[in-house]
A protein has these predicted regions:
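Conserved GNAT-fold acetyl-CoA-binding loop/helix
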Residues: 19-42
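A conserved beta-turn-beta hairpin within the catalytic core of GNAT-like acetyltransferases
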Residues: 73-84, 94, 143
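A short beta-loop-alpha structural element at the N-terminal edge
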Residues: 4-19
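Conserved beta-strand in the GNAT
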Residues: 55, 61-70, 83, 88
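Conserved active-site alpha-helix within GNAT-family acetyltransferase domains
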Residues: 100, 112, 116, 123-145, ...
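A short helix-loop-beta-strand connector motif used in the catalytic cores of GNAT acetyltransferases and
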Residues: 43-55, 83
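Conserved acetyl-CoA-binding loop-helix of GNAT-fold acetyltransferases
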Residues: 86-89, 95-108, 133, 137
């Protein structure tokens, strides 16, 4: 077994988070540097009071990440709503309790923030890989149908600018 730590990512953790995202697929290539756009975006993320990025480390190795946004709300007696995005575990570390540990911490933080509800969208392709079972085991219910509209392609600069450093 390994020593698992789930913590809030800080300014110094950009490369760790990018590395986990790169390793979500077997054989994913970990970037050597972040692009200017990635650094600017990360700076905005870590400075935001509404966003929390979680970083899971197994024996000090970054192996998982998830993001929670707490949105103020004038409904539900002004209780905020939490949104979960980008739950990722490195391919070689899946099915070891890492996503569950991150989500349990995230849910505890959402409760502490007084959130009325936590919303999580999961792609249909994850119905067969265990992710939906995990979410259900943590109390999430498939009670709504989500819709998504992509307004633009991801900026090419996020990928190509990495080479420019």
């Amino acid at each position: 077994m390994f020593d698992l730590v789930v913590r809030t990512a800080g300014a110094e953790d950009l490369m760790a988070v990018l590395g986990v995202h790169a390793r979500r697929d077997p054989g994913g290539e970990v970037p050597r540097s972040a692009s200017g756009l990635e650094r600017q975006t990360w700076d905005r993320v870590v400075r935001s009071d509404e966003l929390t990025v979680y970083l899971a480390e197994a024996d000090g190795d970054p192996v998982g990440t998830a993001t929670m946004m707490v949105m103020p709300n004038v409904t539900y007696a002004c209780a905020p709503t939490a949104f979960v995005e980008a739950v990722v575990v490195a391919a070689e570390h899946r099915r070891q309790g890492i996503a569950g540990a991150m989500l349990r911490q995230l849910l505890a933080d959402a409760r502490s923030a007084g959130c009325n509800k936590v919303q999580l969208l999961s792609h249909k392709r994850h119905a067969s890989d265990g992710a939906h079972r995990l979410y259900s085991s943590l109390g999430f219910e498939p009670e709504a149908e989500g819709f998504r509209l992509y307004l633009q392609q991801a900026p090419a600069s996020a990928q190509s600018a990495r080479a420019d450093g």
